Structure formats: structure tokens, C-alpha cells
Amino acid sequence: MTPILTTSLPLPLHSQGKVRDTYRLSDRELLMVATDRISAFDVVLPTPIPEKGRVLNQLSLAWFRETAGLVRNHLAPDLSIPTSVLSEQPDLEQRSMRVVMAEPILFECVVRGYISGSGWKDYQRSGSIAGERLPGGLRESDRLPEPVFTPATKATSGHDENISPAELAHRTGRELAQTLERLSLSLYGFAAERALQSGLILADTKFEFGFHGGDVILIDELLTPDSSRFWDAQRYRPGGPQPSFDKQFVRDYLEQVGWNKQPPAPPLPDEVVEGTSVRYLEALRRLGPAGPREPRGVRSERLRRHVPS
């Protein structure tokens, strides 16, 4: 299947993000379309990942439905997409999500259940994450005593900035900050248990919220390989990096080639593209309502080739 880098629908373009093109359906609703673009270190890469947008959209839809009892989200009451909108690009249907308009809260709500990524780097430097002191002697990928809420600014350009919960409260007000932390920790706890039932560890994840009708609701994407770290529970061995089903594979490659993390980003080689696509499809197979449409033998062979045991 040909990867999709850009879209062009007969609707007003509301915004274009790193991955999604968002169109205005009406004064109250938007259509979010997930492309195959991929970003790393806050920079969009020139090479698309086939099927990635479909995986992101299908997983987000499934998680939004499954967590609706915990927190309201931006899914529209009617999720059907007018036939005329996709008549020229019918392959976008599984990549499209109809949502209500909300006012974004411009902070990312990150929850870490395990110490990895930037959290591990912060701990090595200071013994803490987001200003919260952690026990000494932790190894990379260790499970934390309790999940930690580590918010970050949401930069329109450039790199996001990690901040402490206290700084979040200073910027948003104490009541809103407490609401964001409570909802984020509740969602993480639910999703971590659900992922483990599918053989995956939810190491950390990012939530985004907005205001709609005076309420705080979940927006953007939810518990996807773009916004989360998913590890294979059967192969979990703390003390170093873990085999994962997310875009860490791309980050690792970019670190290896010595990219300075400033645009333009280098192109990805074919083996990294296919390896990333395989990881995303495996996450969908395990977590989503319907897995990738390929025979199990083909999937297993591709998985063995790119995610060795």
C-alpha cells in the first residue's frame, strides 16, 4: 500500500500537525486524518511509514471508546463521515476521525510507570524526574514504585520542555493541574492493566486534554505507538533498553547516525521503515479491535525478522 504523506479533502483545512491533517466539517466539528508522517525529537522526518496512520487512528478510536467511562473525549456523537468528503480518497476512511471542537490545554500530560527515555536521562543527572526525587539505584527500564506524572509544555515549534507538577499548577491554576494529574494517572492505571492482558507493558504515555462545554475532555490521540512506549512483557529485562512496539526503533537509528536533532532530518533506510511498520502493526494486532490484514504466517515471519527474540 502506498504511504500517505499529505491529504487534500474538499473541506477547509483547520490545521496541519506533525502527523495529522485536520479539516473543518462544521462550526462545531472537525475531521482528523492521520497520515503516515513520522516525527522524532519534535522534527518531522522526510520518510513515511506505511500503514502508520491507520494504526494510530484505529487504536485511538478503540481506546477512546474503552475509556469513555473514565473521562469524556472529543469523539463526535455521529462518527460517520459524509461520502462526498472521501469520494476522491476512499482509502482515508480508516485514517479519519470525526471529533467535536475543543480548546486545547497547551500542556502534555505524561505518565511514567517505568524509567526510560528522557526520564532515565533526567534520573541519571539528578536522581529525580519532573522535580520528584526517586529512590537511588534504579536501573534503566526499572518499574517505578508508583506511576509518576511528568507534564511538559506543548511547543508549537521547537522542542517540548519538561516541567514539574508544581510549575504546571503555577501556569494553569492549582485546580486544573490537579484535575489533569488525576485523570492522567487514572487513565494510565486502566491502560497499563489492559495492555498487560495483551502481553505488553505500557512504560509511559502522553495524554492531551482540552475544554469543551466547560468540561475537561481527552483530545488528539490516545495510547498509540506515537504517544506511548509499549514493551513486550515476555521479554522484559530491566537494566537496559527494551524491545518495543513504538517509534523508539526510529529514535535509536537517528541516535546511531549522529543526527543533531535539528531540521532537516535524514531519510530513513528501507529496513528501518519496514521494521517500524511491523512494530506499529503488531501493536494494533495486540491492542486494537481488528489486526492487520495479512496472513498470520506472513506477520510472524516479518515480526521475527525485525524484532528478534
Language-model region placement:
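Catalytic cores of nucleic-acid ligases and guanylyltransferases
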Residues: T35, D91, F190, I217-P225
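C-terminal helix-cap and adjacent tail motif
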Residues: L222-L287
